[in-house]
């Protein structure tokens, strides 16, 4: 099913190896989820659509066929970066995850899939403050509201780099709330890719921002961000 979706929607035909990696990913996710809460989505059909396909949809926004550096903040069980890496093995992925149980899962996943990616056990804002202008792409699927993740992630982007924010049906409200952050952090909204997932599985709005200029002083310490978000 996943192969059909990706072929029909993105024009990409998965290889036998890639199909095997998605199978192994699903099997490890379900097995690990029995003792560690990683996801509420456990059926294969739902995982194919809501985890794997949903993650790979990001490739509609940027060219991942060339070598690019990508940072995934708060990836949890590896979404969206690991499905992207399976399909586009040339990208250089760094995952920043604060919860040790999820880090341990990602380490097992790395070995099971035979993929190369970096796993950093840290909070996104801490990692960001030490890695200014290091990445071509930064993304975060379920880490927080838009104005927060922009402050976490934009400082890590190279000028001209892209921040991708996968959002749901309330994306317009989040954009409104993030208007000040967008201005302060010097990013521009380039694209809103709106998509209805197959089998009435939900709505996705993938928001693409471009960094126009680097601004020092961000991200601020998390207590300040939480008390006074941009």
Swiss-Prot record:
Please name the Pfam families in this protein's record.
GidB
Under the heading InterPro entries, the entry gives: rRNA_ssu_MeTfrase_G, SAM-dependent_MTases_sf
Q: Where does S-adenosyl-L-methionine bind?
A: 74, 79, 124-125, 141
Keyword match ATP-binding:
no
- Using the UniProt record, give the first listed, main subcellular location: cytoplasm
Q: Which GO terms describe its cellular component?
A: cytosol
Q: Which UniProt keywords apply?
A: Cytoplasm, Methyltransferase, rRNA processing, S-adenosyl-L-methionine, Transferase
* Subcellular localization: Cytoplasm
- Molecular functions per Gene Ontology: rRNA (guanine-N7-)-methyltransferase activity
**Where on the tree of life does the source sit, at the highest rank?**
Bacteria
Where is the secretion signal located?
A: none
Q: Does the keyword DNA-binding apply?
A: no
Bilayer-crossing residues are: none
Q: What is its EC number?
A: 2.1.1.-
Q: Which family does it belong to?
A: Belongs to the methyltransferase superfamily. RNA methyltransferase RsmG family.
Q: Which PANTHER family match?
A: S-ADENOSYL-L-METHIONINE-DEPENDENT METHYLTRANSFERASES SUPERFAMILY PROTEIN (PTHR31760:SF0)
Function statement: Specifically methylates the N7 position of a guanine in 16S rRNA.
User: What HAMAP family is this protein classified in?
Assistant: 16SrRNA_methyltr_G
This one is known as Ribosomal RNA small subunit methyltransferase G
* Gene responsible for this protein: rsmG
